[in-house]
Amino acid sequence: MEDSQLYQALKNYPKLQDTLDSIENLEDDTKSEPSECGSPTERGIPSYYLAEELDECEEEDSEEDDDNLPTEIPDPPTVDMLEAIMEDEIDDTAYQVHFEAKQTWKPVIETGGNERGKFTLSVPQNLSALQLLQWETGIHALAERLGGCRLLQISTRGTRDGIEFTVRETPCVSPASDPIPSTSRSSSIASNVSTRQTESPGSKSNTSLGIPEAPANLIDMGAIDKEFILAAISPSDPPYKNTLRNLFGSGDSFEQYNQTGIYSLKELVIAGLKRKGIYNRIRIRCHLEPQFN
């Protein structure tokens, strides 16, 4: 009964038959379309089948590559083999490389050879440009100050290795016109010792240069081994005693310094004390008026 009523209600629904027909046609079209979910169709091959064929191709390619590889792997080249290859490719005679030997640093280098009083003060290592300039300026200034001494004449010259010093001794203020032979000085009596005669302020030589004449009284060569005494300033201190040979170190040094023979005994003693490095100590303690025993 209920089915008949439902049927009557649906039957009375407008265009019901057309709607049912369209639904049936839609179902037929859906069944006739090809499946795209992996079923065999005329348009292509399923994806899973393609994946299997791709794997097989890769395996075949890898097998072909393995066939092309050598059956035995050679050993790596040794050091001897590499050296042999390098010797064949490079000509050692075409290249000449010279390395300077590393020398140890020395503070003073003798550069004069047979010439005395010539040496080079080496440049200190690891100096900056400013430090090197200050070092050179200080050394030149010191040499200029020392060069003003009566007994020495110092000249400096900058070189690649350092500063070259040339030291010359100046035994006299002005050379004598006629040097006295050493034989005449050695033949004099040792006890005949006198000091230089003083000149008046207005007395000068007749030469055009106006240089004072050399004193006539000279120190005898025989006095070099005679002991002299410098009296102490303080009565409690002992006097200073020595000889000219000991002050100058040897008879040759004294002979070289006193070539002209124009120095007085006092000047010779002062020069000897300076050579020995005790001048300042002695002049504070003693009177610089030597007397022979």
UniProtKB/Swiss-Prot annotation:
The record marks K274 as: Interaction with the Nucleoprotein-RNA. Homodimer. Interacts with the L polymerase; the association of P and L forms the polymerase complex and positions P optimally for encapsidation of newly synthesized genomes with the nucleoprotein. Interacts (via N-terminus) with N(0). Interacts (via C-terminus) with N in ribonucleocapsid (via C-terminus); this interaction allows to package the L polymerase in the virion and positions the polymerase on the template, since P acts as a bridge between N and L. Its main location: virion. This is Phosphoprotein. InterPro entries: Phosphoprotein_C_viral. Residues 268-293 are annotated as: Interaction with the Nucleoprotein-RNA and template-binding. Nonenzymatic cofactor regulating the function and conformation of the RNA polymerase and part of the transcription and replication complex. Binds the viral ribonucleocapsid and positions the L polymerase on the template. Acts as a chaperone for newly synthesized free N protein, so-called N(0). Plays a role in virion assembly. Keywords: Chaperone, Host cytoplasm, Phosphoprotein, Viral RNA replication, Virion. Residues 22-47, 55-74, 171-211 are annotated as: Disordered. Residues 106-167 are annotated as: Oligomerization. It comes from Chandipura virus (strain I653514). The lineage of its organism: Viruses, Riboviria, Orthornavirae, Negarnaviricota, Haploviricotina. Residues 1-55 are annotated as: Interaction with N(0). Changing I270V: In strain: Isolate CIN0309R, Isolate CIN0318R and Isolate CIN0331M. Residues 197-209 have a biased composition (Polar residues). Belongs to the vesiculovirus protein P family. It is found in: Virion; Host cytoplasm. Changing Q103R: In strain: Isolate CIN0309R. Residues 168-189 are annotated as: Hinge. The record marks W135 as: Involved in oligomerization. The N-terminus is disordered and is involved in binding N(0). The region of interaction with the L polymerase is necessary for transcription. The hinge region is highly variable. The central domain is involved in oligomerization. The C-terminus is basic and essential for binding the N-RNA template. Residues 176-196 have a biased composition (Low complexity).
